[in-house]
Amino acid sequence: MKIEVIIINLTGMILKMRYCILEQVGVGGEGHLYLARDMELGNYWAVKELPLEKKREARLLRLLEHPSIPRMVDYVENGDHCYLIMEYIRGKS
């Protein structure tokens, strides 16, 4: 059986005319994680890409506050994906 794998590189993509994707920094079971730069403020953020079906769970994340959970600061929908803009914490997971 032949399996086709499609890799989409989001480097250079700009979300909400504000967050510029710089590089992919991780891959998980449900999506990809990117490093982005806020073109307005100069801050760096983590951008978690999820399928649009996870929209409800993504929006609930903004309600969670705990020192061990990166804070969600923005949310973007684009096509069949949603993007969570979150605190970027350097290091390994």
Annotate each predicted stretch with a short phrase:
Residues 28, 64-67:
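Conserved N-lobe motifs of Hanks-type protein kinase catalytic domains
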Residues 47-48:
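Conserved beta3 VAIK motif of the Hanks protein kinase fold
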Residues 75:
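Activation-segment/catalytic-loop signature of the eukaryotic protein kinase fold
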Residues 79-93:
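Conserved short submotifs of the Hanks-type protein kinase catalytic core
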Residues 22-28, 33:
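Protein kinase glycine-rich loop
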Residues 51-63:
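AlphaC helix of the eukaryotic protein kinase fold
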Residues 37-44:
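Conserved N-lobe loop of protein kinases adjacent to the ATP-binding glycine-rich P-loop
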Residues 3-21:
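A short, low-complexity linker immediately N-terminal to eukaryotic Hanks-type protein kinase catalytic domains
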